[in-house]
């Protein structure tokens, strides 16, 4: 398989997003689809109120169009491709509903936690059912070894945890200009390398399509952001990277490659647990990126630092799987 397929997929995806954004952002402004800012959040965020959100629609359109066209053109379209697109679209639609409630009904929290969880769970259950019926393996691979353990139907529990947990973890990371776009590009880039190394060219194409789309989006989302991806983008990216981990049989490696997402989630869990048990907070605010804001770090410094940490995690993940 020619390596040009990777370059083509990334370039096409990047260009679609870059071309769509200048057209779509003014449209969102006319509809008054602006982001509401929580009053309890950092005061510096209040100036971001009204910034167009739901930019994740552009990311999704780019990913879908690029993946379908490139995989079909190079004859690598497979059942796995459809599963990836299903999860991405499914979680994207769920995020879209959440965003619509926020901007139309002016309810800043969007869907209730229960509603969102049920939606995430339904998509994950359908994914597992189709995954199982398509004959994909239910074995759990131990990274860096030749060991694997067939979990059978119990694999479904792991899969549900990964999809629901992954989408929420990535969603939590979307709190600063360019933070999620950059860390997502790095994480999907790592999985693209590993998928290509396995010969799963359709998964690799999907991953680089995501990389191209979020990098194109980053042009308009870097500080000061002209648009936010909203839950439309963040939930879709979270579900997608979990699905990629499942299809590449590198489920456990997601904890490493997605290390930034894990740390952000743990900071929230630690904060809530500490406050409930002791009445005291460990961090000034969670997720962790907000803690650094209140400590006095500039937004750009936090974002670049998290990108660097994400890159180290991604390199470690590739090293564990390929060279150990």
Curated annotation (Swiss-Prot):
Its cofactor is Mg(2+). It comes from the Bacteria. One of its GO terms (molecular function) is phospho-N-acetylmuramoyl-pentapeptide-transferase activity. The keyword Metal-binding applies. This is Phospho-N-acetylmuramoyl-pentapeptide-transferase. Its EC number is 2.7.8.13. Pfam families: Glycos_transf_4 (PF00953), MraY_sig1 (PF10555). It catalyses: UDP-N-acetyl-alpha-D-muramoyl-L-alanyl-gamma-D-glutamyl-meso-2,6-diaminopimeloyl-D-alanyl-D-alanine + di-trans,octa-cis-undecaprenyl phosphate = di-trans,octa-cis-undecaprenyl diphospho-N-acetyl-alpha-D-muramoyl-L-alanyl-D-glutamyl-meso-2,6-diaminopimeloyl-D-alanyl-D-alanine + UMP. GO terms for cellular component: plasma membrane. Catalyzes the initial step of the lipid cycle reactions in the biosynthesis of the cell wall peptidoglycan: transfers peptidoglycan precursor phospho-MurNAc-pentapeptide from UDP-MurNAc-pentapeptide onto the lipid carrier undecaprenyl phosphate, yielding undecaprenyl-pyrophosphoryl-MurNAc-pentapeptide, known as lipid I. It is a multi-pass membrane protein. It is found in: Cell membrane. PANTHER family: PHOSPHO-N-ACETYLMURAMOYL-PENTAPEPTIDE-TRANSFERASE, PHOSPHO-N-ACETYLMURAMOYL-PENTAPEPTIDE-TRANSFERASE HOMOLOG. One of its GO terms (biological process) is cell division. Belongs to the glycosyltransferase 4 family. MraY subfamily. Keywords: Cell cycle, Cell division, Cell membrane, Cell shape, Cell wall biogenesis/degradation, Magnesium, Membrane, Metal-binding, Peptidoglycan synthesis, Transferase, Transmembrane, Transmembrane helix. NCBIfam families: mraY.
